[in-house]
From Swiss-Prot:
GO terms for biological process: rRNA processing. One of its GO terms (cellular component) is nucleolus. Residues 702-714 have a biased composition (Basic residues). ATP-dependent RNA helicase required for ribosome biogenesis. Involved in the release of U14 snoRNA in pre-ribosomal complexes. Required for pre-rRNA cleavage at site A2. Belongs to the DEAD box helicase family. DDX10/DBP4 subfamily. The gene is DBP4. SUPFAM superfamilies: P-loop containing nucleoside triphosphate hydrolases. A motif (DEAD box) lies at residues 201-204. It comes from Coccidioides immitis (strain RS). This is ATP-dependent RNA helicase DBP4.
Length: 806
């Protein structure tokens, strides 16, 4: 029993320690025991669940709440090495759980070091794409919800100023390389001197030529004493790449290195050999036959994605369509990825933006309409399906020229793929529908031109020429399959043969064709003139009026616009490829008939340019269109075609001279020496200035004198107006008669013939209307009060008093 209190007599309560101190002590004990368990951990031992690993309670609670319990192969082998602080090179198949393999060690290592917001940035996670960075950040939020770390997402497309305000308080950052480097260079409060961990997801993509300079600049800002982890489905082993990141004895963990296939076993892989002009027909037929599926289609360029999306959207295949590419705004990209993730049945057209790392749930089909650049890109593309041991199917479309080379590349990477054929009965052609849509929508027609150009360019820039050969592709037929009348001009293809054309003998380029060839060309011309022109031919010869007209005209070049000589002349092609200087005509050296048969210049202009109208100008106005004909009705627009007018002055004798006449050298010398003329000129100008000064002074004196006279006259008029007689009103009496005393002496003086002025005289600055208006508008003045000398009766006194009171 507790002893009683000495003063109150009540039993004393037992002494309780502060709850905070107890909690702090308990946390310290847990941390020390966790550190001891990590030190005793054998990295080679393979655990099956997260609870078997030495992890903190906060991490275990976050994993359990996110329904992560069992470990995958890459997680069971990489996490023990990572939480012990070793550098890691991790490689595993797509969909094997690589994200948790580096997020769990990041949380654990910072937790054991008791990292707080006052310690600054502790871990940096780099991702090649924005969508993958968002996905990593969402997983980090789920499993780290019970930790006290502050985590941030830094990607392009968001407000830089808002990120700068919060960046200094972050402990973990998930970012893309470009935006991260921008903050390192521009954000003053951002400090990376204490970073403990650097993680590169999809490391082979980040370390390639596209991000090489950016990653090198980021690594220069980081301390060398740090832990570095690289994860990817196709890992790099280049010594140069590892040296750039300063890795120290990294642990290379490849889970499926000894596997028979580099792709998941549950993935069914097929390829279809289809000619390039039939690819869109095959894709349309495939979508129409698999409406109850979730499909992801990969293209090589964003222009192709936009064109196919707009075209198929108008034709309504019966399944929701989405499109994703790198030129969209970030908000639209996030919205599209979330829509496709939630959808049960949908078709997404995408570039390689969605090829790496993104986890779209339950994707049934991955279609690669364009051949991937290498086997690694193929692995990442097909990795969007068959994730986490689920079933999936992938189809690769190959042109006959790409089949042999691509199959060899896939075989080297241990990728099993089988060929399938398409049933001709189920294939449907959409070329006529595309032509009809291009006829109705000029914007879609222009987009088709850009899609064609971007595809050919993507094939042209590939390094593997055994697979990608532009010259072996049927470009004319491919353009027709897009609904276009012909293949647009591809300048970089013509430039390939510039060197061979330059080295060719000169006479081969300038010698005209034989008589037989010219006869054949003449027959071809006649056939084209007599050819029936359809509505579609006229439509495609039309010029756009609303969609980038000049740029579109450069892309398109019809056969009728090309000179026949230019077709057979390779030198002309080379000159046109230069685009700066173009050869108008070519002649053989020493041609005697060089100037014959040309006729006069006016004659040529009449043949080529049409009707000429002579206006006041030197050159005639050529009327070669209705717009020029309408221009004749506007005087304002015709001014620029008229000559400039000249102004003439006439002397006393009536001879015309121009305003400015220049003397020639002889006339100037006839007047004397230059110094003498200059002295004479100065003397004349000085005399002229003196006379002008005297004249100006006289004018100033005259104005001053007139002003003084006006002021005196005004003062005189005011004084006369004030000295005039004043009328005095007589008091009211009962009798109506008037007495003689009622008139003042001044009034009686009017009998002498002088009448007082009836109204106030106007001033010098007033007009008659001003005086009348003033008299009518103002209140009439009261009569002047009577003087005491004029008060004679009691009534006069009362009237005077009343006036004074008022």
């Amino acid at each position: 029993m507790a002893p009683a209190h000495s003063r109150t007599g009540k039993p004393q309560k037992p002494f309780r320690q502060n709850n905070r101190s107890l909690k702090r002590k308990r946390n310290e004990d847990d941390l020390s025991s966790l550190t001891q368990r990590v030190g005793e951990l054998d990295p080679k031992s393979l655990a099956e669940s997260f609870s078997e690993l030495p992890l903190s309670d906060a991490t275990l609670q976050g994993l359990s709440a996110s329904h992560f319990k069992t470990l995958t192969d890459i997680q069971s082998r990489a996490v023990p090495h990572a939480i012990k602080g070793r550098d890691i090179l991790g490689a595993a198949k797509t969909g094997s759980g690589k994200t948790l393999a580096f997020l769990v060690p990041v949380l654990e290592n910072l937790y054991r070091k008791q990292w707080t917001e006052y310690d600054g940035l502790g871990a940096l996670i780099l991702s090649p794409t924005r969508e993958l960075a968002i996905q990593i950040f969402e997983v980090l939020r789920k499993i780290g919800r019970y930790h006290t770390f502050s985590a941030g997402l830094v990607i392009g497309g968001k407000s830089l100023q808002e990120e700068q305000e919060r960046l200094g308080r972050m402990n973990i950052l998930v970012c893309t390389p470009g935006r991260m480097l921008q903050h390192m260079d521009q954000t003053a409060a951002f400090d990376t001197a204490h970073i403990q961990m650097l993680v590169l997801d999809e490391a082979d993509r980040i370390m390639d030529m596209g991000f090489q300079s950016t990653v090198d600049a980021i690594v220069e800002h980081l301390p060398k004493e740090r832990q570095t982890m690289l994860f990817s489905a196709t890992q790099t082993k280049k010594v140069s790449d590892l040296a750039r990141l300063s890795l120290r004895d990294p642990e290379y963990i490849s889970v499926h290195e000894a596997a028979s296939s580099a792709t998941p076993a549950s993935l069914q892989q097929h390829y279809v050999v289809t000619p390039l002009p039939e690819k869109l027909d095959t894709l349309w037929s495939f979508i129409r036959n698999t409406l109850k599926s979730k499909i992801l289609v990969f293209f090589s360029s964003s222009k192709q994605v936009r064109f196919v999306y707009e075209a198929f959207r108008h034709m309504q295949p019966g399944i929701p369509l989405l499109h994703l590419h790198g030129r969209q705004k970030q908000s639209a990209r996030i919205d599209i990825t979330s829509k496709f993730s939630r959808a049960k049945y949908s078709c997404l057209f995408s570039t390689d933006v969605a090829a790496r790392g993104l986890d779209f749930p339950a994707v049934d089909w991955v279609i690669q309409l364009d051949c991937p650049e290498d086997a690694d890109t193929y692995i990442h593309r097909v990795g969007r399906t068959a994730r986490y041991e689920r079933d999936g199917r992938a189809v690769l479309f190959l042109d006959p020229s790409e089949e042999e080379g691509m199959l060899k590349r896939l075989e080297q990477k241990k990728i099993p793929i089988e060929r399938i054929n398409i049933k001709a009965k189920k294939q449907q052609s959409i070329m006529n529908q595309l032509q009809n849509m291009c006829f109705k929508d000029p914007a879609l027609k222009y987009l088709g031109q850009k899609a064609f150009t971007s595809y050919v360019k993507s094939v042209h820039i590939q390094k593997d020429k055994d697979v990608f050969n532009v010259k072996s592709l049927p470009l004319e037929e491919f353009a027709s399959s897009l609904g276009l009348p012909g293949a647009p001009r591809i300048k970089f293809i013509k430039g390939e043969d510039t060197k061979s054309r330059k080295n060719a003998p000169r006479h081969l380029a300038v010698v005209p064709s034989s008589d037989e060839d010219s006869d054949e060309e003449g027959l071809t011309k006649k056939k084209k003139e007599n050819e029936v022109r359809t509505k579609y031919d006229r439509m495609f010869e039309r010029r756009n009026q609303d969609v980038l007209t000049e740029h579109y005209t450069k892309l398109i070049r019809d056969e009728d616009e090309i000179d026949p000589d230019e077709k057979d002349n390779p030198a002309a092609d080379a000159d046109e490829d230069d685009g700066f200087l173009s050869v108008k005509r070519r002649f053989d050296a020493g041609d005697e008939n060089l100037g014959e048969g040309l006729g006069s210049e006016a004659e040529i202009d009449g043949i080529k340019k049409g009707k000429a109208v002579q206006i006041d100008g030197k050159e005639p106005l050529i009327i070669d269109s209705k717009r020029r004909e309408k221009l004749l009705k506007s005087k304002k627009k015709l001014l620029k075609y008229k000559g400039k007018g000249t102004k003439l002055v006439y002397d006393d004798e009536g001879n015309a001279h121009e305003i400015y006449e220049m003397e020639d050298e002889q006339q100037f010398k006839a007047q004397g020496d230059a110094d003498a003329q200059r002295a004479k000129y100065l003397e004349l100008e000085a005399e002229r200035t003196r006379l002008a000064d005297i004249r100006d002074k006289e004018i100033a004196k005259q104005k001053k004198r007139e002003k003084k006279e006006k002021r005196r006259a005004r003062a005189r008029a005011e004084r006369e107006a004030e000295d005039g007689p004043v009328a005095v009103l007589a008091p009211y009496e009962e009798d109506e008669g008037l007495r003689e005393d009622d008139f003042s002496a001044e009034d009686r003086g009017s009998e002498d013939g002088r009448a007082p002025p009836s109204k106030k005289q106007k001033k010098w600055f007033q007009s008659d209307s001003d005086v009348d208006g003033e008299d009518g508008g103002k209140k009439r003045k009261r009569p002047r009060a009577q003087s005491p000398a004029q008060v004679e009766t009691l009534e006069d006194l009362e009237a005077l008093a009343a006036e004074l009171l008022e």
